[in-house]
């Protein structure tokens, strides 16, 4: 973790009158919360897909054996929707969320045109961004796990819903 990040955390704690008891990297903290100790003996990858980055932690033999990050995440998908549908970023994010539970969505583009779009049509348009996200995560998992696929991959985080 970069020194400036640690110093910022310590400064915030000090201003709040608190002391640091421990500092854990986010992917390791996620594993500790989401994967029971009995499952950590298995070779499992936990991928936390956030807005800007996807954090990856891998377990085997009861412990975290590797962790890493790729700079591709949910915002890439939102940007692709924005580009293809001519939506500003907040409306593209809203459309992305609506696609999770609806087969069609109604959007108004930046020119004021209202269009009803089918989920499959949108997914086809943004498939290059989806492929980049999945390929980046897959490549990093293999790199972290000595070029072998883990027994399971668990997806968490807001970006995992897309």
Could you tell me what each predicted segment is?
Residues 151-160:
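Glycine-rich beta-strand-to-loop/alpha-helix junction loops that act as flexible
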Residues 1-44, 63-65, 74, 89, ...:
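Nucleotide/phosphate-binding catalytic cleft detector across ATP-hydrolyzing
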Residues 3, 51-53, 159-162:
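Gly/Ser/Thr-rich loops at beta-strand to alpha-helix junctions
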Residues 60-95:
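Metal-dependent phosphodiester-processing active-site neighborhood
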Residues 37-67, 81:
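Gly/Thr-rich phosphate-binding beta-strand-loop-beta motif of the actin/hexokinase/Hsp70
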Residues 13, 48, 81, 137, ...:
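Residue-level signature of catalytic and energy-coupling elements of molecular machines
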Residues 129-138:
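A general structural motif
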Residues 1, 22, 48, 69, ...:
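Small/polar loops that bind or transfer phosphate-bearing groups
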